[in-house]
């Protein structure tokens, strides 16, 4: 079997126009895959220089393969099973700024550089006041980026045509706003002056983005078969689902410079990221949170099996299409398409997503993902959404513990104060006390949910039904 490098595989030389902070599975299977498709299908013609954001990382592994690797997409596409392998050739080189700081800083001197993309984890966009301008490099990602921007400003004497377009991909709501704020903190801490601040404001753009693709990562279980198929000894294969979405809160002139739409990619440039964030939380995370306890207490362990179950499948459909979708303000057809994509993702034959892994911290999840929908539905329709109410009753039942009908032990996991509260309430043996006690817990909900008209009575009725008839019969009663 051949080693994978530029001697054994074709690698096109393209202008270095993108600096990418992060070399992990997600960026390589999402951003670099998107850039590969843009290079193939448009005149984007750009390569990526990867910068390792922390001192330990995968730069050496990448360089050993001349920065070539394969993406293995697996899942359903319009009902068809897809399992494809693509060699990604967009990374020109990978740098470790902790050992190659001069080369890192020289990236700022390249006139063709135009974009910065990052994924340094949720903890990556943070202000560290101990960072100094003369550090080689600054320890934080925003510190390194400020060093780079300041060097570029000086190199080109404040030329406003040499600004950079910055797309953070960290999983933080309004990540661009947070990154920009942190850069301003470094400008002030390091006294970089008003001229630089004005150049940064006017020549550069830091844009909030929302990313969505499940990336399981290195396919340990299938790697021998994959290597056999590609005939390369690729140690950086990364597996991902087919679905991808990148929402970028930026004007159309930025979209023209980053023409992902012309490559047929699901990359949207929008005036506000917020409705898309709300859509994802409501239609992807919201159903996950309620389907998991309903499925588990019905004896179903995997998300895909729950979707395909005769009764639970109808429950999930009801919650998504009849309840949660009714609470969002985006165009109906767009929401329907997104919900159908979500169901296809839940049905992915290659991913065994255990419902128990979703049930960790179910109460806070319900509060952020499902409760807003329950309230909006009540406000708009004048009645409670039965599926979301049953989902809450299922969570409360799950936290009772005990064993399922098949003998499997029920082991809830949440913050100690939530676990203690549920233990005390269930010890009373009274579903009215359990319901009212949970709904009154302001440390969970930020308010007393007993004040929502009819909610306590509806949850109690579902709890009683689950105790008497079991989960499946209770679900059938609301369909």
UniProtKB/Swiss-Prot annotation:
Broad enzyme group: oxidoreductase
A GO molecular function held by the record: mannitol-1-phosphate 5-dehydrogenase activity
SUPFAM superfamilies assigned to the protein according to its UniProt record, in alphabetical order: 6-phosphogluconate dehydrogenase C-terminal domain-like, NAD(P)-binding Rossmann-fold domains
InterPro entries in the record: 6-PGluconate_DH-like_C_sf, 6PGD_dom2, Altronate_OxRdtase, Mannitol_DH_C, Mannitol_DH_N, NAD(P)-bd_dom_sf
Catalytic reaction(s) noted: D-altronate + NAD(+) = keto-D-tagaturonate + NADH + H(+)
Annotated signal sequence range: none
CC per GO annotation: cytosol
UniProt-listed Gene3D superfamilies: N-(1-d-carboxylethyl)-l-norvaline Dehydrogenase, domain 2, NAD(P)-binding Rossmann-like Domain
Residues involved in NAD(+) binding: 18-29
GO biological process, one term: mannitol catabolic process
Protein keywords: NAD, Oxidoreductase
E.C. code: 1.1.1.58
Pathway: Carbohydrate metabolism; pentose and glucuronate interconversion
Family according to the record: Belongs to the mannitol dehydrogenase family. UxaB subfamily.
Protein name in the entry: Altronate oxidoreductase
